[in-house]
């Protein structure tokens, strides 16, 4: 049976996984009375085996889920807490029987912004139910065609349900259907191939296991080393051309996600693409993880031969959008997939809101947001560049992690908190220099790192967690403004330029140390390196001017409007030392 009945919405979202469900909820929370449809071939009560890469959140993704989507209580009650990231390198690759056989960068305290591990099947099942309760309409079917008309013309999505075919129309279409690439294929919007992805050429094998004996990993007793759990962190293990994750995704069933990202030119697909080969790889190279695997019950095994891809356009002038795996992914390292989703979700909501309201600058926002999101995804691509050569070198990789953490906590996290990624004026100034750093300083650091790996240089283990590595008790997730303490959570209340000023300065110090320890005086005095050092200091100075300007322009604004309103109201407070009667109510 077929029907040509037309069903109309403001936004149709193809795909009801993490990206699509977060997008739907964010739209409904921020645009009153918006009509949203979700389409997915998976049933509402999807099974617990409906799992995929991406179970660990970092700060920006956690802020999206907990703050922007209002799900903090839900996360506390339903998903494991995350105690930061740990990094492990074998002391001797031939001896990896226990965690003591590794060098470590342990997280030693709870980071300031809470993060979580996610059981994706449960999260998506629960969030779909919440979205339906908020008014979203769910179609359990498969998209068979989408007519992407130009501009503001209505788009039509043809959906095959169980016993009928329907057509759904909307002005805005979001592809969150993952690797089906519904829009990507139709518009030739996808970019594959390591030659166009900064050399990233990786695959992934992973298992879900339950009833794990976690004491094989760690006893949980480390009183002199940490104030947080080692097990409930995301643990990373490294070796030549690969890294592994170990993520607890369910407390009751003691379930773990355990997987590897491997680079094909070091570890060919044919050597690791089955459960047996993956198990043998663990036994030979990370025996402690093999023992953990043997202690458990297998839930499932997966292999993905090609991880990395990106899109040419993320937000089209023709009112279509790609988000999540439908848009891009490069690697699971640093768990940045959900971060790219978070920034894209908020960008899409603001574009849709502006266009539905017929705001004059709606198209300008779309263009600026598209440029920034492409630049941000390119930065994630850049963070994965040259991994195949550097992952297994404990010294060089630890310095690299420190370097990348500095940008994350010093610039990107405060940018998200202050909603600067939604400020077109700021983005126009930021995106160009951001790309300059990606194509200049980052490339130089990674090329120098390759030289140091080839020479077998030991520069020491750079600990991204501790405050004794640079000058002035600096540590990477230190923030330089009181945006958390004084809840500067409204748009542009936190001063992004403060974070940028300090980050540029400390990166300059890191860069000088890196050159000195790696190359000596020749490294310090090399003209290219002097230029990079000078440019960092110049950007720090320019950011200081931006900091002063922003402080001046916002001098009359309170840090937080709700707190200011309460303080004004409190001026009328008078103590009343009298209880209200209650016994009479009982009688």
Write out the residue ranges for each language-model feature.
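Glycine-rich FAD pyrophosphate-binding loop
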Residues: 28-53
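Redox-cofactor binding/interface segments in oxidoreductases and associated redox assembly factors
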Residues: 14, 175, 322
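FAD/FMN-dependent oxidoreductases across multiple families
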Residues: 240-242, 248-252, 264-388
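Beta1/beta-strand and adjacent pyrophosphate-binding region of the FAD-binding site
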Residues: 4-19, 37
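Predominantly flavin-linked oxidoreductase catalytic cores and closely associated redox partners
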Residues: 46, 130-287, 345
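N-terminal FAD cofactor-binding segment of flavoenzymes
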Residues: 46-95
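C-terminal helical "tail/cap" subdomain of flavin- and related membrane-associated enzymes
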Residues: 352-587
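Short beta-strand to alpha-helix junction loop
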Residues: 107-129, 267-273
